[in-house]
Amino acid sequence: GQGLATYRELIRNLSVKSKPEGGALTMVLDRWINSVQTAVAEGGISMDSSEFNKAVEERILSVVRQMQDLVHGFDFARLLTLYFRAFTDGDDELKGKVLKWFRGEYTTRTEAKQELGVTVIITDDDWYEYLKLFAYFFRQAGYQGLMVFFDELVNIYKIPNAISRQYNYEKILTM
């Protein structure tokens, strides 16, 4: 659980200039959807038009399709699409479930499948792949990228299991 715990902390403490204290994941996702909606409106499609939501969804899906070729990109893209639909439908419960998945809080695949229809969860084995997907997504969402700062990295050396300690050390070096 050390790698997944690291991932959870990184996502929980995600910050942007307008929300420097952390917890910015929802804001980033909502800002992305709002920016796509604004771009569609500036393209001449009225927000009152029946074509508006369709055009927004097409733009969102074009970003999502680009992610499907990345490792775990298909599931990540599916969850972004679910978040978008929950956003437009005002379904706060579904948004919360998608955010729970993005934060790595699902502990079983069964629970994720029942609540979201996805058969994959973020684990110790693949958390770094999801961090890379977030970095890619942030670029698509209009940010310059994702910068990761580790404070008190010495805590890795305090992990009692040598294999876990080495694995986490190697992941951080890879970053």
Predicted ranges, named:
Residues 127-131, 163-175:
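Substrate-gripping "pore-loop 1 plus following alpha2 helix"
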